[in-house]
Design a protein with these regions (language model features):
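Bimodal "functional hotspot" detector
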Residues: 2-184
């Protein structure tokens, strides 16, 4: 009887050690997993930057001038980043920002060699230019996007719909090719 009590006590101690040992391993493994997660959360993704050309009219409205800009493309496409840079405008007093500040870019999509640029109605409503201004507005958009070699044509839409013209002077109902005549 004494021997069975000793064996039972030893078995109890042995089982306690086994359970405690398993628990300790699980805690260590759990800590390793937690550490890995924390390390991954603190990593920052590399911000990709590219150099592009953005086209602005000169202050005399006689030609478009290419301006080199470096833009971040993390979380967006290079085409949208280029349009955002065009919409930011320029600080150069010899150049003019042509897209109204109130206009909103709704999106840029590419299908084959054609980019579709969608603005809200603010582009039309707040644009103040005449026929030359409209030509430079369209030319700035088209030439900025066709500076990417894979883009050959640009379709400008308003609220997702094709429009005949922005202000009555220039047909934008179909995709437009690069406007090199404005670069003289």
């Amino acid at each position: 009887m004494k021997m069975t009590k000793i064996i039972a006590a030893l078995m109890l101690v042995l089982m306690t050690l086994v359970v405690a040992g398993c628990d300790k391993d699980n805690n260590q493994q759990s800590n390793k997993s937690t550490n890995t997660v924390v390390e991954n959360k603190t990593e920052k993704p590399a911000e990709e930057k590219i150099k592009i050309k953005v086209y602005f009219p000169n202050s005399d409205a006689t030609k478009l001038v290419a301006v080199d800009k470096t833009v971040k493309v993390a979380g967006t496409t290079k085409y949208k980043a280029a349009m955002d840079a065009l919409m930011e405008g320029t600080d150069d007093s010899k150049l003019t920002t042509v897209i109204p500040k109130q206009a909103k870019l709704l999106g840029v999509t590419v299908n084959g060699d054609t980019a579709k640029v969608d603005f809200d109605k603010g582009l039309i409503k707040h644009f103040n230019g005449g026929s030359t201004g409209e030509e430079f507005l369209v030319g700035s958009i088209v030439n900025t996007l066709t500076d990417f070699p894979e883009i050959k044509r640009v379709q400008i839409t308003i609220d997702g719909r094709n429009v005949e013209t922005l202000k009555g002077h220039m047909d934008v109902s179909k995709p437009l090719s690069r406007m090199d005549e404005l670069l003289k």
